[in-house]
Amino acid sequence: MASKSKVAKALRTPKFSTRKENRCKFCGRPRSVYRKFGLCRICFRENANAGLIPGVRKSSW
């Protein structure tokens, strides 16, 4: 779990737009965040398997 100060800092609007940090909306993880969903890979997988993300389903071939 990310520290509360880092999450709070990421939520603030930065002075320069290039300083915006992508963090997971659920857990605050800074790495491997999918921009389209705003979730890290772990939270994305959990929510997709639970059917909470519309239009996403597990692929098989």
From Swiss-Prot:
Q: Name the GO terms of the biological process aspect.
A: translation
Q: Keyword Zinc, does the record have it?
A: yes
How is this protein named in the record? Small ribosomal subunit protein uS14
The cofactor remark states:
Binds 1 zinc ion per subunit.
Cofactor annotation: Zn(2+)
Q: Which residues form a coiled coil?
A: none
Supply the alphabetized keyword list. Metal-binding, Ribonucleoprotein, Ribosomal protein, RNA-binding, rRNA-binding, Zinc
Q: Which Pfam families match?
A: Ribosomal_S14
Q: Which residues bind Zn(2+)?
A: C24, C27, C40, C43
Lineage top rank: taxon: Bacteria
SUPFAM superfamilies hit by this protein: Glucocorticoid receptor-like (DNA-binding domain)
